[in-house]
């Protein structure tokens, strides 16, 4: 009788029970390579997927010799899919909520720069959401959409220049996860990525120019922005929509009862459309 699992195991982790003849896997020896699963013609060995490994689009997560999962930083693109997929909460992001609230409580000038997609996050008008941010203690609110207008203008000029040079297309530089993907996994795409800064990049500089000594807090939906902020000296903290929503609830702020706040400079609708599919390209047109 063929024993494919036994013959193909590189670590000799498969053995047979002398009484029953059933195959057993020694998990102290097994390295979870999957060779036995692939070689068994009877499908007697079942692969149990690990949610975080399955969710990772770049295969950056794997187990070590002790069966412990690790994230390979040289492959990770900080998309957050593993965080959402893990049913045990074993993967978590490092929050800066308490740092932000501590600075506000200490009387420091803290400026909020919310992403355009905040428009669809709350069941309230944008002025009411900004009013809630003011009630939390933010000294001012500057829309990232204002920075998006600069991104749109600069990317449009850059695209025209590259087309004139013979380049057929150009991709956006707005998404930090995409930038990590290109740098780590598709280096051949690097020449086609725009060198224009993201909306957060420009908005943070607008905030720092207006409030040189202030702490600038980017508020958005994406945890990859935390990585981008680490490389940007003008962004001090990053909060997700989930975190800002928790603060609003924790402080018992009713969005329908706050004093609406209107930003000093309103952004064009195209700048708010960056969050939609095709929004960046549409703005450039």
Label each residue range with its predicted role.
Residues 2-27, 35-77, 81-96:
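Iron-sulfur cluster-binding cysteine motifs and their immediate structural context
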Residues 87, 92-285:
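Iron-sulfur-associated redox domains of electron-transfer enzymes in respiratory
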């Amino acid at each position: 009788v063929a024993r494919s699992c036994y013959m193909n195991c590189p670590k000799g982790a498969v053995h047979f029970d002398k009484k029953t003849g059933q195959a057993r896997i020694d998990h102290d020896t097994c390295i979870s390579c999957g060779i036995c699963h692939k070689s068994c013609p009877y499908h007697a060995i079942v692969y149990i997927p690990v949610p975080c490994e399955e969710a990772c689009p770049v295969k950056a997560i794997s187990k070590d010799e002790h069966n412990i999962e690790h994230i390979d930083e040289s492959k990770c693109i900080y998309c957050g899919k593993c965080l959402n997929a893990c049913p045990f909460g074993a993967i978590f992001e490092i929050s800066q909520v308490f740092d932000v609230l501590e600075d506000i409580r200490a009387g420091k000038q803290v400026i909020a720069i919310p992403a355009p997609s905040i428009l669809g996050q709350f069941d309230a008008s944008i002025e009411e959401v900004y009013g809630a941010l003011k009630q939390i203690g933010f000294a001012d609110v500057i829309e990232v959409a204002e920075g998006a207008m600069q991104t749109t203008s600069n990317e449009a000029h850059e695209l025209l220049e590259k087309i004139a040079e013979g380049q057929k297309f150009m991709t956006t530089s707005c998404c930090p996860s995409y930038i990590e993907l290109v740098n780590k996994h598709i280096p051949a795409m690097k020449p086609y990525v725009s060198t224009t800064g993201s909306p957060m990049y420009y908005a943070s500089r607008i905030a720092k120019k207006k409030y040189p000594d202030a702490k600038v807090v980017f508020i958005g939906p994406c945890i990859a922005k935390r990585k981008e902020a680490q490389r940007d000296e003008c962004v001090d903290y990053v909060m997700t929509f989930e975190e800002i929503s928790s603060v609003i609830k924790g402080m018992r702020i009713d969005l329908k009862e706050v004093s609406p706040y209107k930003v000093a400079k309103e952004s064009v609708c195209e700048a708010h459309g960056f969050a939609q599919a095709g929004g960046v390209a549409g703005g450039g047109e």
